[in-house]
Amino acid sequence: MTKEFEFLKAELNSMKENHTWQDIKQLESMQGPSVTVNHQKVIQLSSNNYLGFTSHPRLINAAQEAVQQYGAGTGSVRTIAGTFTMHQELEKKLAAFKKTEAALVFQSGFTTNQGVLSSILSKEDIVISDELNHASIIDGIRLTKADKKVYQHVNMSDLERVLRKSMNYRMRLIVTDGVFSMDGNIAPLPDIVELAEKYDAFVMVDDAHASGVLGENGRGTVNHFGLDGRVHIQVGTLSKAIGVLGGYAAGSKVLIDYLRHKGRPFLFSTSHPPAVTAACMEAIDVLLEEPEHMERLWENTAYFKAMLVKMGLTLTKSETPILPILIGDEGVAKQFSDQLLSRGVFAQSIVFPTVAKGKARIRTIITAEHTKDELDQALDVIEKTAKELQLL
């Protein structure tokens, strides 16, 4: 037993040497613009809590009331005895919100992509994926028997090349993130849809980082570009801007009926507890009734980005509240993040394998809840630390 998992130890040691080992920070407070880490109050620049909904009073009240009325859990999978009225109400709300015929809720955004891709694709099909798509899309594709082609990131000429060479399939499915989580750029969805229609292909968009952020009342990239009704599959999370937990697929009634019968994560996982489901429903209502959250998000994003650019730091070509500061070296990125934390700013380094080797970064994410004072404090600390590390 002394040699058990020695091969894993060797890899872990290698990760530490190459600065790709991750120390998981523990929060000791509610998620928000400031949080407590290691008994220290710090400005939070690493969460996906874009609109501050994790602590919105309406969501908290909805969750508490649901627990009192329906209990802590559901006790079953959806297809046996775990579908409460509220689960179907949430799906109706999501379908209306995304302007589709129907929707289906999964346990997470990750399992949504796994469930959708693994169930609708066969060996007669081909899936065509952007090279920087999320890991859940990549893993979902691995679960299928379909052929796979990867096109260069947001390169429409390369996408068209792949489409031209893949004419002899039952279905060709183009899959893209709506917003790319590590760079913050938005997929050129109008061009993708135009090519799909030209070559008779299907389109699937993962709006994990766009729902609640882009489009009318946060409906996502499809709505942002005025493409409602022209994208076959929309997927996303209920855990980022929505502020709770889960994932969903939205599309035609035929698609959703099929996923309800074939989507394995949906079929074999216990349904969401009442508190989660009720809070998700309330979040959609808040998006529709309180547009000021999105307005503040974009005001804060514009200000923070302008200050980082003025400072002279190298950013990605972000178009969203995801504002990564490019570092390159993994060790320097980790050092930058650690020093920021010691000075009261929680901004995690992103290193391999989340991004390619040599492309480490500090990924800052701005939220609607940040005050100008908090943003200014964070900017001062970032500038001071960057100068010390000779990044400015």
Swiss-Prot record:
The keyword Transferase applies. Substrate binds at H134, T354. Pyridoxal 5'-phosphate binds at G109, F110, S181, D206, D207, A208, H209, T237, L238, S239, K240. Gene3D superfamilies: Aspartate Aminotransferase, domain 1, Type I PLP-dependent aspartate aminotransferase-like (Major domain). It is an enzyme of class 2 (transferase). Keywords: Acyltransferase, Biotin biosynthesis, Pyridoxal phosphate, Transferase. Its cofactor is pyridoxal 5'-phosphate. The modification N6-(pyridoxal phosphate)lysine is found at K240. Pathway: Cofactor biosynthesis; biotin biosynthesis. GO terms for biological process: biotin biosynthetic process. Belongs to the class-II pyridoxal-phosphate-dependent aminotransferase family. BioF subfamily. Homodimer. This is 8-amino-7-oxononanoate synthase 1. It comes from Bacillus subtilis (strain 168).
